[in-house]
Structures are given as C-alpha cells and as structure tokens.
C-alpha cells in the first residue's frame, strides 16, 4: 500500500487485513514494529482533536519521530502551495505525511510526492481512517458485515464519513440506509432515505453524524434549528429504547449533545462512541505499518 487516500481504493481483502492487524496490535498479539529513525509530519489544515491526537498517539507507539508543523506559523500563511509544502517536508527527510485539508481530492495535486500519504480527511470527500476504525468497531461487535442493517443519520451531503462508510459497508455486504433533512440528501450515493422511526426497531447499527456547519451557506445555517433537527432525526430515549437488544450506536465525533443524540445516551450501554476512539489508535497504527513497511 503506497498511500491511503480513499476507501474506494481499498479492496475488501485490504480492509480485512488492516482490521486484523489493528486487532492484533490492540490485543498485544502482534509485536510492535520499530520505526526508530523514521519521521512523520502531520499537516492539519482543518481543526481536529480525535484524528490528529489519534495519529500522534499511533506514531508514538510505533516509535516514529514527529516533525512539528502548524499551518498558522508555516509558509502556508505566506501563500506557499500544498505541493511545495509537502515537497519541502519530503526533501528534508520525512518518511510519511498525514494530511487533512478542506479541499476535496487535494491529493490529486500531490502525484509527484514520493513518500506515503495518509489522508486524514479531504473536505466533504473521504475520511478513510475513520471508516476503517468504524469497520473495526463493527467487526469486534458482530464478526461479520454481510446483511447488517446500518442506518446513517445526519448531514449526508457534506459528510466525508458518510461517503467513506457508504462505499466500504456496501462493498462488505451490509445494507446501508440514510436519514437526513431534504437539504442534505446526496443523490450520488445510491442508498434509500428512510424515516428514522420506520426503521429504528430493525437496524443493527445507528451511525449518527455531526452537522457540518462549516460547509453550509448562510441561508442554510439561518434555517437550521437544533431542537427541530433533534426531534426529527436525533437519537432520543424513546428511539433508543426501541433498538434491538444487540444493536449499537456510533458517532465519529465531535458530538453535539442534544442535537444528534440525547446527552445521557452518549455513554449508554449500546453506545460504542468512545470505543471507536480507542480503536482509532490501533487502526492508525496498522495503516502506518502498512505504509512504511
């Protein structure tokens, strides 16, 4: 694996291999590789807590040294292009670049970069490591994907998580459904849009998404009402209690409590939200190992 850019670029065999390797790192079954003498730069052009810190933790566990990079104090603020920034880091000896960028498909401009790139999110395009850690969490729970009913609720149109998980879950044989306000429907993703109350008793996984306020126009934001959204599309106690006994609740976070999900359900027994974060470290360790070996 030369780069990790999109879930659409991964075969199902590669997905299972990454999940297995991550699980072995988590259990201690797999010995940690020694990447002492390897250097990584994390380039985050959008804000991040979980993804950035998770990658940093994964890098530390694998023995990598991290090159400090802050967009606000770099030459990006002087107008330097993404390509020139990445080429500079390659030239000074970085072995791996982890990049989050607000532009969809930013990596298409980096074809002449000769070190591995891990996409940590591109605009509303793809978020492959989030999808992989979600798949790991689901596989831990069920041990399979074929036939699972997955309901993805939220801002489908603007969510890179929705797009990545749609492609990967479909490829693995799961049944994907969406629930979203009409304004956030994405017709390019061929899955049915359903009323949450019509399917809540039959789904195996409810995957809630954050509202992507930063990608909305002024008119769209003016129309948005958190209480109305929560009533029509959020997971409240009534809906939670209708879930099957084995069903689980997921969210890539950050969570807007009281909007996508009732606050006291974030750590309820069916919630795997913080388990996803835990798994993210081991999954990203597996990705880094594949990219650098």
Curated annotation (Swiss-Prot):
GO terms for biological process: 'de novo' pyrimidine nucleobase biosynthetic process; 'de novo' UMP biosynthetic process; amino acid metabolic process. The lineage of its organism: Bacteria, Bacillati, Bacillota, Bacilli, Bacillales. Catalyzes the condensation of carbamoyl phosphate and aspartate to form carbamoyl aspartate and inorganic phosphate, the committed step in the de novo pyrimidine nucleotide biosynthesis pathway. Belongs to the aspartate/ornithine carbamoyltransferase superfamily. ATCase family. L-aspartate binds at residues 78, 160, 210. It comes from Staphylococcus aureus (strain JH9). Keywords: Pyrimidine biosynthesis, Transferase. It is an enzyme of class 2 (transferase). Carbamoyl phosphate binds at residues 50-51, 100, 127, 130, 253-254. One of its GO terms (cellular component) is cytosol. The keyword Metal-binding does not apply. PROSITE patterns: CARBAMOYLTRANSFERASE (PS00097). One of its GO terms (molecular function) is amino acid binding. It catalyses: carbamoyl phosphate + L-aspartate = N-carbamoyl-L-aspartate + phosphate + H(+). Its EC number is 2.1.3.2. InterPro entries: Asp/Orn_carbamoyltranf_P-bd, Asp/Orn_carbamoylTrfase, Asp/Orn_carbamoylTrfase_sf, Asp_carbamoyltransf, Asp_carbamoyltransf_Asp/Orn-bd. This is Aspartate carbamoyltransferase catalytic subunit. NCBIfam families: asp_carb_tr, PRK00856.1. Heterododecamer (2C3:3R2) of six catalytic PyrB chains organized as two trimers (C3), and six regulatory PyrI chains organized as three dimers (R2). Pathway: Pyrimidine metabolism; UMP biosynthesis via de novo pathway; (S)-dihydroorotate from bicarbonate: step 2/3.
């Amino acid at each position: 694996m030369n780069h990790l850019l999109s879930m659409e670029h991964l075969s199902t065999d590669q997905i299972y291999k990454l999940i297995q390797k991550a699980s072995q790192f988590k259990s201690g079954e797999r010995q940690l590789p020694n990447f002492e003498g390897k250097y990584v730069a994390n380039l985050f052009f959008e804000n991040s807590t979980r993804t950035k810190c998770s990658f940093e933790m994964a890098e530390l566990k694998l023995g990598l040294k991290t090159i400090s990079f802050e967009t606000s104090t770099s030459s990006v603020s002087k107008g330097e292009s993404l390509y020139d920034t990445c080429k500079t880091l390659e030239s000074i000896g970085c072995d791996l670049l982890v990049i989050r960028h607000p532009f969809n498909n930013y990596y298409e401009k980096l074809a002449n970069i000769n070190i591995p790139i891990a996409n940590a999110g591109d605009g509303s395009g793809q978020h492959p490591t989030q999808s992989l850690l979600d798949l790991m969490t689901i596989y831990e729970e069920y041990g399979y994907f074929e036939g699972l009913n997955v309901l993805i609720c939220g801002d489908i149109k603007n969510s890179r998580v929705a797009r990545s998980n749609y492609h990967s879950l479909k490829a693995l044989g799961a049944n994907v459904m969406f629930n979203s306000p009409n304004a956030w429907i994405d017709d390019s993703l061929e899955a049915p849009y359903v009323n949450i109350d019509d399917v809540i008793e039959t789904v195996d996984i409810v995957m809630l998404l954050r509202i992507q306020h930063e990608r909305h126009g002024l008119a769209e934001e003016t129309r948005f009402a958190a209480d109305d959204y929560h009533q029509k599309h959020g997971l409240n106690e009534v809906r939670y209690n209708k879930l099957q006994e084995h069903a689980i609740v997921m969210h890539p976070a950050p969570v807007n409590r009281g909007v996508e999900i009732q606050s006291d359900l974030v750590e309820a027994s069916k919630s795997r939200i913080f388990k996803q974060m835990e798994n993210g470290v081991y999954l990203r360790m597996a990705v880094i190992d594949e990219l650098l070996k």
